[in-house]
Regions:
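Short linear sequence motif anchored by a di-proline
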Residues: 1-176
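A short, hydrophobic C-terminal helix/tail in secreted or cell-surface proteins
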Residues: 177-181
Length: 181
C-alpha cells in the first residue's frame, strides 16, 4: 500500500502537461501523506489543470466520523467496489511524484525503501477523485518492488496520461519497472 511519497517542484514537472496550475506552488514535500492537500492533474473540457486535493476519499455515502479515508484502490477490483466503480468512469486524476516509499516488515522492525525512476523523471500515478479528495490506484508489485511490498502504484508513461484522463477510453497502462533504492 502506498502511504507516503515525495513530490518536489510539481509545477515545473507538469508545465508541458497542464494548462493551469495557479493554486499550486513549486514547494517540496519529502513526506507526502494521507490527509494532506497534494497536487494532482485533473482534466476539464478546456484543458488539464494541476490542483491541490486532499489525499484520502471519504465516500459521499459514508458517515465521516465513522469512516477512515480510502487512500488506495486496487485496479483488479476497482470496477466492483461501491466506493470506486462510479469514480473510475467519471473522475480520474493523475498524482505527480518523484518517488514513493514502501516499508519492508520483519519481526523486529519496519525498514523504509524509496522507489523512483532511474532517470529521475517524475512518476505519474493513476488516481480517482470525489469532490476535493483523491486516492491512488495500486496494482500487484513488479519484481523489484515485490521484495519489499506486494503492491505498488499504477504508474503511467507520459504518453498515457491523456488516454487515462479521457473518460471515453478504457483504463490501460504500461507496467513500469522501478529499481529499489
Amino acid at each position: 500500500m502506498c502511504g507516503r511519497y515525495v513530490i518536489t517542484k510539481p509545477v515545473e514537472k507538469t508545465v508541458k502537461i497542464v494548462k493551469s496550475s495557479t493554486t499550486v506552488k513549486d514547494d517540496e514535500n519529502f513526506n507526502a501523506h494521507p490527509s494532506q492537500a497534494l497536487p494532482i492533474i485533473k482534466s476539464y473540457s478546456n484543458g488539464k489543470t494541476l490542483e491541490l486535493v486532499k489525499w484520502g476519499i471519504v465516500p459521499s455515502w459514508a458517515k465521516q466520523k465513522d469512516f477512515r479515508p480510502l487512500i488506495n484502490a486496487r485496479i483488479e477490483t476497482i470496477d466492483e467496489k461501491v466506493s470506486f466503480k462510479k469514480l473510475i468512469k467519471t473522475t480520474r486524476c493523475v498524482a505527480v511524484m518523484d518517488g514513493f516509499y514502501e516499508w519492508k516488515r520483519s519481526k523486529e522492525s519496519k525498514t523504509p525503501f524509496y522507489f523512483t525512476r532511474e532517470d529521475k523523471k517524475p512518476l505519474y500515478v493513476a488516481g480517482i477523485f470525489e469532490n476535493n479528495e483523491f486516492c491512488l490506484i495500486t496494482e500487484e508489485a513488479s519484481q523489484n518492488v515485490m521484495d519489499v511490498h506486494h503492491r505498488q502504484p499504477v504508474i503511467l508513461d507520459n504518453n498515457e496520461i491523456d488516454n487515462y484522463l479521457d473518460l471515453k477510453k478504457a483504463v490501460s497502462y504500461t507496467h513500469l519497472t522501478l529499481p529499489t533504492t
